[in-house]
Regions:
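Short, extreme N-terminal segment that most often corresponds to the first beta-strand
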Residues: 2-32
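Low-complexity intrinsically disordered segments
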Residues: 37-173
Length: 173
């Protein structure tokens, strides 16, 4: 993992619909964190825990489409802005801080994959859903192919893996 000190790319965590329209978004700085990817992407971070709680069975956005939208990401098709740049036009939410220690698995229902948080040095949710990674400081450069591979997929946070379905584990290598 190579983290370079260049101009920083800033990220917002988004819930989007199937057409990639923003439903709600969150800003890490509202929780006292930096908004570069590596400034808040670790297990136990209060911002990431609060966002992922919304994706848990207890949360309002369980099994939703997620993207960690970077401000250097590509523009949306047939639009003048990328998702990060569009955020001001949509609802910013700031839920009360939540802990998610009982939720061990980040599950991708679109790709039938999962990440076991106990096996990751950094938090898998922001890394796997990052869009625009590698284009700014605070990003993960020379990243493995899994980084960003879950952007815009249906994600949930679970205590255990879904019954009756085969899910493939994703690891950070």
């Amino acid at each position: 993992m190579n983290i370079t000190a260049t101009m920083g790319q800033y990220y917002y965590a988004l819930i989007i619909d199937a057409a990639s329209k923003i439903l709600v978004w969150m800003d890490a700085s509202m929780y006292g964190n930096g908004i570069k990817l590596t400034e808040h992407s670790y297990v136990g971070n209060n911002f990431v825990s609060t966002f992922e709680f919304s994706l848990s069975p207890e949360g309002i956005y369980h099994k939703s489409r997620v993207v960690w939208a970077g401000d250097y990401a590509d523009k949306e098709p047939e639009q003048e802005k990328n998702l990060h740049e569009q955020c001001d036009e949509y609802k910013l939410i700031r839920p009360a801080e939540k802990k998610t220690t009982k939720y061990r698995f980040v599950v991708n229902h679109t790709k039938k994959q999962y990440a076991d948080k106990s096996k990751w040095e950094m938090h898998p949710l922001p890394l796997l859903t990052a869009e625009g990674n590698g284009r700014g400081g605070g990003d993960i450069h020379d990243a493995p192919p899994c980084v960003g591979s879950w952007a815009r997929d249906v994600i949930s946070i679970e205590e255990s893996l879904p019954d009756g379905e085969d899910f493939e584990e994703v690891v950070f290598e």
